[in-house]
Amino acid sequence: KEIVGLDECVIDVAVTFNRPDCNSVVGIAREAAVALERKFTPPETDFDTVDEISTRQYVNVDVRDAELCPAYFMQAAEVKIEPSPLWMRRRLHAAGLRGINNIVDVTNYVLLEVGQPMHAFDYKEISDKTIVVRRARKGETIIPLNEKEYELDENILVIADKSRPVGLAGVMGGLNSGIK
């Protein structure tokens, strides 16, 4: 274990359903700072790097339910799919996740660090190059990345393209739209 770098300490934390803010490294650090009466400094983020104009060249975003989704951020990029760096694969492995590729692994890493679920869409799989954030239609179905089929109703927020749901908003991306 020591030779391949799998000897780090892992803390397994059970979080109750009413504390989703603690489902990340940042959330646990914030809670620990409060408990230990220490100052918490959140990690810096830089959203100024998002280039909305370049994204619009590739994909249109149509948010149809601003009450359930007041903001939707997307970045389009041409990226070569390849293995993630070893340090990232090790951290994902320590958290019980297997490395898949650089794109999927980054979304999982962000989830672990800040608790924000994300899904990387395969551009070729998005019909009419439009992402629509809307409520599901009664009877619509989706097969997310866990490969189980779900029947949806109007109370569920989905990320869709022009023809079908491609993700369950904030939960899991669709198998039909993921990076392969």
Enumerate the language-model features and the residues they cover.
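Phosphate-rich ligand and nucleic-acid binding surfaces
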Residues: 1-180
